């Protein structure tokens, strides 16, 4: 959902709350839980869960390794769920012609940089830059070029958009800001 008018525009950015992140966090959690249960079952010499058999696994060394991978996977899955819960990377790009300001806001990790907000005068915008790298996975980025600053990305790195959609977004933004498009 984006907000557009003649003098004001807001583009919302989806962060970590994507379907793929939910999928991978669940898969990692279930897989690592299975590893951990099999490792503990090999130590206890009985099956904790009926569908995970550990009768052929010796505790030393396989059971220890299974427990280790299970614990490591659980930590990784908790990290993924924490990232999803905080919605890291979400935010918005706000372009206000009346105030003459561009504001870019993103949510970060807890601490000093939890809220990341950059503001620039619209008059300092030089161009909208497109970057396309057709490697696996394909990387299609839209940047805003600001005088005396690094190029600032306006979309997610993992955003899966077609070349046509990217060009349309960039052209629409360039028309709104009355700047040129670079790249491609």
From Swiss-Prot:
Keyword terms of this UniProt record: Chloroplast, Membrane, Photosynthesis, Plastid, Thylakoid, Transmembrane, Transmembrane helix
Function: Seems to be required for the assembly of the photosystem I complex.
Stated name of the protein: Photosystem I assembly protein Ycf4
Cellular location(s): Plastid, Chloroplast thylakoid membrane
Family designation: Belongs to the Ycf4 family.
GO cellular component terms listed in the entry, alphabetical order: chloroplast thylakoid membrane; photosystem I
Disulfide pairings: none
Family matches, as InterPro entries: PSI_Ycf4_assembly
GO terms of biological process kind: photosynthesis
Source organism, top-level taxon: Eukaryota
NCBIfam families linked to this entry: PRK02542.1 (NF002712)
Membrane-spanning ranges: 21-43, 63-85
Membrane topology: Multi-pass membrane protein
Keyword Thylakoid: yes
């Amino acid at each position: 959902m984006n907000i557009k008018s003649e003098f004001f525009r807001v583009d919302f950015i989806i962060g970590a709350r994507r379907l793929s992140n939910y999928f991978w966090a669940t898969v990692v959690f279930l897989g690592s839980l299975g590893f951990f249960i099999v490792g503990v079952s090999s130590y206890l010499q009985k099956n904790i869960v009926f569908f995970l058999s550990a009768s052929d696994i010796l505790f030393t060394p396989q059971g220890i390794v299974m427990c280790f991978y299970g614990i490591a996977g659980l930590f990784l899955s908790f990290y993924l769920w924490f990232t999803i819960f905080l919605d890291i990377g979400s935010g918005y790009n706000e372009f206000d012609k009346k105030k003459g300001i561009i504001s870019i806001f993103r949510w970060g990790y807890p601490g000093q940089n939890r809220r990341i907000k950059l503001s620039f005068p619209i008059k300092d915008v030089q161009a909208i830059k497109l970057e396309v790298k057709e490697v696996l996975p394909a990387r299609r980025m839209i940047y805003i070029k600001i005088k005396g600053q690094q190029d600032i990305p306006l979309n997610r790195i993992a955003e899966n958009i077609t070349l046509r959609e990217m060009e349309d977004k960039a052209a629409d933004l360039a028309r709104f800001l009355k700047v040129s498009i670079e790249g491609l």
